[in-house]
Amino acid sequence: MEKRNDCTDRKRWATLKSERIVSRPPWLSVRCDEVQLPDGRVIPEYYVLEYPDWINVIAITEEGLFVMERQFRYGLGRTCYEIPAGVMEKGETPEEAARRELEEETGYVGGTWTEIATLSGNATSMNNLSHSFLAVDVKPNGNVHLDATEDLEVKLLTRDEVYALLLNDEIKQSLMAAPLWRYFALGGLGKK
């Protein structure tokens, strides 16, 4: 399938003034810009959330099981099913970050890796991208290293169980549901 990118700079907005109003690196910054549209109109306050890029991984074991996580998400106030995910650290490529996060959160490593999507959570007001990978034939190595704020349970689910989670709207994070839907829409990308 040929990649197509219609996100061009054909009609860029001009930044007239910019002020950082919240700065909490590396997690979040909030910027307030004064911008001018191509037709000359000026928007005096346009807010942008600045985040580092994110990654997530559809990881499938040699036995064809999906490596999933369940964890409480404070923002939603509920426990959610998710695919392994995290933040890219400075100097990492998306794949390096994805491999690191998969191992840190689940203890799974190896396999064959393919980047299957690069998405924006909200291109209107967020500056980062989320890089989604498919990792096939991953194996456990037992080296889990959770961050201080992580409290998760690793679950191995069948293809049908993951598909049912999607159909029943049980995967709440859109940047995790989207690559899973893509995986299933493309027939499992020919894998497992």
Where are these regions (language model features)?
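Unchanged
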Residues: 44, 54-56, 61, 87-175
